[in-house]
C-alpha cells in the first residue's frame, strides 16, 4: 500500500512538472526551446522587410501577433518549419 501511494505521488509530481514545459521551434534551422513559465503558445510570424517581402520568425509567447501568414498554437512543435 505504501509503495502504491509513493508511486502515485511521484507520478503526480512528474505530470505536474511536464504540464508547464511547452516546446517550440525558435529558428528557421529547427532549433527548439522549452518555453519559460508564462509563455504558453508557440508562434511563427511574418516580419515585413520591404514591399511584398518578409521573413519568418519563431518564438515562445504569451500572446500572438495577428497576420495572414502567422501561426499561433499551443502544442509541442506546432509552429512548424517550412
Curated annotation (Swiss-Prot):
Record's GO cellular component terms: extracellular region
GO molecular function: toxin activity
Signal peptide range: 1-21
Swiss-Prot/TrEMBL keywords: Disulfide bond, Secreted, Signal, Toxin
Domain of life: Eukaryota
Tissue and organ expression note: Expressed by the venom gland.
Compartments, record wording: Secreted
Cysteines joined through disulfide linkages: 24-42, 35-60, 64-72, 73-78
Assigned protein family: Belongs to the three-finger toxin family. Short-chain subfamily.
Protein name listed in UniProt: Three-finger toxin MALT0063C
